[in-house]
Amino acid sequence: MNRPVHFEIHATDPATLSKFYADVFGWQITHMPQFDYYLINTGDNDGPGINGGFVKRMGTGAAAGAPVNAFVCSLGVASVDDAVAKATAAGAQIALPKMAIPGIGWQAYIRDPDENIVGLHQQDPNAK
């Protein structure tokens, strides 16, 4: 109980941003026109993870250089280096470069094309 069960990514243009996440992370997106909502299926239900949705951003995002004022999620990836390369090739920017979390793994943060911060996590007990 009290564990995350759904997430939402706010987007200026949900249709465009959903394509970025589908292309970079392989997510399946289903548009629900009656709600102007985009359901996100992040993968099969056999492993850890949750699904979510894209919602139209109401108003402007945070000012450039402002601290994050959000609930930031990290995505489990096979390779932080590969995920960062694929994301930046698709229009993301590096928010914080790859860093070791000793004995746990590697972490990096990107800023998607609509300025949302997303963590990328690669498990690696040998990370130093």
Ranges and model annotations:
Residues 1, 8-49:
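Core segments of cupin and vicinal oxygen chelate
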Residues 1-18, 70-75, 122-128:
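N-terminal beta-strand motif that seeds the catalytic metal site of vicinal oxygen chelate
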Residues 49-56:
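A short, structured beta-strand/loop element
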Residues 37, 74, 107-109:
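Short hydrophobic/aromatic beta-strand element in the GNAT-like acyltransferase core
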Residues 9, 30, 84-128:
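Vicinal oxygen chelate
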Residues 44-48, 60-61, 79-81:
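Short, charged/polar surface micro-motifs in flexible loops or helix N-caps
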